[in-house]
Amino acid sequence: MLKQLENKKIKSEDIWIWDNNSTALALLAFYEQISTKYNLVKNNANYGPRFFAVPYIFDLLPDFFAVTDPDLSFNEKMPDNFLEYLKQLTIELSLFKAGLALDIIPTSNFNRELMSNEKCTVTEWEMQYWLFPITKYNNPKVFNAGIDTTFAVYNKKFISNGFYNAVRVADNFTCKHLPWYKDNIISEEEKNMLNTKWANWH
């Protein structure tokens, strides 16, 4: 993710890495390697993926900011000004956030048997986020669809709309969630790390 952000001309001093009290040795070693280049904040406990919405943290954030999980692969065709485009969508549509759609096209590499929960596959679950296009947007297409911690730009002005108040931008903005692909099968150690109350797929 860090390399992808740099390729989009995002300055390293504008990138903040928030760690939720990780114990994985490999990850801790990685933090040591990058701590002089990026802003690194270590929480003293695992507060979950939405900890930044807690008032005493949220109040410190700028009016517009972006949050992402690290396991996304950007679309190679996504424009370098994608942050500004997402920001403008939050203004035009009075939204808390605007983010990237997630690719669920069933390629041979896509793990179609991966379960999102006990009742449905990832594909079955994710279909709900492709049902409601906003007709005035065509290139790229924009869908009314909630976002948790997938890459999104946040507009603090509209936090009262609710945490999931969002749109997802498709076409050249559509990205891949790497754990859904067979060539990115995660290790048992990583599965154990993800197998918490915060995980929404397994």
Outline where the language-model segments fall:
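Short beta-strand-to-loop acidic/aromatic patch adjacent to the donor-nucleotide binding site
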Residues: P62-K77
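Short beta-strand-to-loop element that shapes/binds the nucleotide-sugar donor at the catalytic cleft/hinge
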Residues: A98-E113
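Conserved donor-nucleotide/metal-binding helix-loop-beta segment in metal-dependent transferases, i.e.
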Residues: M78-K97
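Short, well-formed alpha-helical segments that are part of the catalytic scaffolds
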Residues: M1-K8
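Acidic ATP/Mg2+-coordinating residue in the GHKL
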Residues: D19-N20
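C-terminal catalytic/acceptor-binding lobe
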Residues: K119-H202
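Active-site-proximal specificity loops/subdomain of glycosyltransferases
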Residues: T23-F64
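Residues at the starts of beta-strands that form the adenosine-phosphate
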Residues: E13-D14
